Amino acid sequence: MSKNQLPSYQVVADEMKMATLAVTPAELHGLLAGLISGGLSQQDQSWQPMLFDYTNDGMGWPSAALEQAQALFNVTSAQLTSDEMVLNLLLPNAEGEEAIFALADALSDWVNHYISGLGLAGAAFNKASEEAKEALADLEEMARLGVDEDDDLQEQAELLEQVIEHVKACTLLIHAEFGAKTSSSETPTIH
């Protein structure tokens, strides 16, 4: 897995299942992204006890699952702090008619856990800009969206892709306001 590439959804799902952790990859990624967007830096390891409390009644995770979470944290932090403004969400990549329902459910889980992560990190939305408040309101609305099985599934799939892109934009906007800034040591020195 490269520095900015997420692991596959199924790999993370299998690891969580083996560790008997009741958290989906989408929930885990959303929570970590929310913690990072809420102000935790990549060097801040306080996310681990928060993760344990939130997902496992305060009990630590098995080392393989924690390594998977650490890698996911690192990739997510790298994406959110990159100048490229690209964020990938860890969502299922299934095929077939039922895939759209699984994707919509996973997106809702991602967004709900992202919002929880913002809260756990202590993001002060009462002092936020209007844009950040609007982005949070949009996320709260998108967390309640679903797919209507009676509607045209192709049209629903296209709309869901637009919603996913809007979730990414809202996440990047919120991170730009609340997220930890990258250290200036990465800036080249001029002699």
Swiss-Prot record:
InterPro entries: YgfB-like (IPR011978), YgfB-like_sf (IPR036255)
Disulfide cysteine pairs (residue numbers): none
One Pfam family of this chain: UPF0149
Gene Ontology CC: cytosol
Entry-linked HAMAP family: UPF0149
UniProt record similarity statement: Belongs to the UPF0149 family.
Name the UniProt record assigns to this protein: UPF0149 protein VV1_1551
